[in-house]
Amino acid sequence: MSFKTIVGLEIHVQLMTKTKAFCSCRADVFDLPPNTAICPVCTGQPGALPTVNSTMIDYAIKIALALNCNIHEYSRFDRKNYFYPDLPKGYQITQYFYPIATSGYMDIDVDGQTKRIRIRRLHIEEDAGKLIHEGDSITQAQYSLVDMNRCGVPLVEIVTEPDLSSPKEARIFVEKLRSILRYLEVSSGDMEKGALRCDANISIYDESAHLQSNRVEVKNMNSFRFIEKALEYEQQRIIEALKNNEDVEKETRGWDIATKMTVSMRGKEEESDYRYFPEPDIPPVIVPVERIEEIKRSLVELPDEKIERFVSVYGIPKYDATVLAMNKEIADFYEACVREIDKPKEISNWIMTEMLREMKSLESENITITPAHLCELFRLMEKGEISMKIAKEVFPTVFRTGKMPGEIIKERGLKQISDENLLENIVKKVLEDNPKAVEQYKSGKTGVIGFFVGQVMKETKGAANPQVVNKIIKQILG
């Protein structure tokens, strides 16, 4: 039996505007006490009228341009009607009939191959509140609390076509999207804070039986890893059902972190269930072509453009350029270092290994040092004052404390010995102590030189400059 996985994504992006979508309440509500950033508009009190946040429109256009969408001069808001405890109005203001943008795409790199993922639509809407479930899980909660602070926070929803064919591709797509959002500075993209939320629709096509399963929606995937894990689980669950000739329910399921399984939440709603109709209190949004062009001119260099430039200007492999460019802070750090130290590949290697390792161990996406720290480390190696081994040894302390490398090296007495007169005496002693190895070298077994270097390093407790030691040995032995 042969199966094909079909995945489409619905991604909600929380915009970093100062105020909410349709009122003047602050939009950055993550750390606020419950129900302290609300007003009659965002809680749907009778007689309260919404006004459109123009920055929200500009941010949506920026995202649409970055995703190669067609932007419509005319768009309109609608009401999506449903009942849920975190939706005090009983409806959500969204764009259903006339979204601000459609027909875009984003290219992703999968195992060295470029794959184009089409984007069906991009529309603006307001967020709902947040339910806090007290108990074991959403299905076992004894009771739930409602925080209305998030009501009315501006969102952009991005809906892809079902072009993704694996859980891995879904993860890669969301990772790259977050990178673009951060470059544009329109969203923090912090999944753990709910600023980027991904729902997936997955179905499986049985190629031997020419049968496609019902579509299942998967929610509660609040990290890149969980996107991949949840979809892997759901993919296997549906395949097993098809193998056993069992029905696959059309439903919404949630990823349970504790059990590492998806659990049924509710039946899958149809669009007709929401009874969409035009929002009567908000006029249509008219975006002149001139405004779109002005926003387009203001766009920064995006990841794909930066990758191309890094490859052509600095001559580093595309893989390196991609790793560096996916994080704007890392890309800027790299360029600042290369401007000072003309070693683009060496600096790229250092960032991708030593620095990313430290960031991972600290579970941080932030760089805690300046380019000056890394440049000083490279200059010390260039001068022969420290070896690569010592540089790697002190770097974790540099990264975690912010101290300059030279200061740490001085404190620990790690400065490399490059004095040829001093090293010559040590080399002579090593050669005198190992006459058999000297004879082997003279008989043509030049590989033994590594043994001599090792003995000198042992004598100096790793402080000798190995290049200088190597040169002295060859001079003495001829």
UniProtKB/Swiss-Prot annotation:
Record's protein name: Aspartyl/glutamyl-tRNA(Asn/Gln) amidotransferase subunit B
EC number(s) stated in the UniProt entry for this protein: 6.3.5.-
Function: Allows the formation of correctly charged Asn-tRNA(Asn) or Gln-tRNA(Gln) through the transamidation of misacylated Asp-tRNA(Asn) or Glu-tRNA(Gln) in organisms which lack either or both of asparaginyl-tRNA or glutaminyl-tRNA synthetases. The reaction takes place in the presence of glutamine and ATP through an activated phospho-Asp-tRNA(Asn) or phospho-Glu-tRNA(Gln).
InterPro entries assigned: Asn/Gln-tRNA_amidoTrfase_suB/E, Asn/Gln-tRNA_Trfase_suB/E_cat, Asn/Gln_amidotransferase, Asn/Gln_tRNA_amidoTrase-B-like, GatB, GatB_C_1, GatB_Yqey_C_2, Gln-tRNA_amidoTrfase_suB_CS
Record-stated family: Belongs to the GatB/GatE family. GatB subfamily.
GO process terms (BP): glutaminyl-tRNAGln biosynthesis via transamidation; translation
Domain of life: Bacteria
Entry keyword set: ATP-binding, Ligase, Nucleotide-binding, Protein biosynthesis
SUPFAM superfamilies linked to this entry: GatB/YqeY motif, Glutamine synthetase/guanido kinase
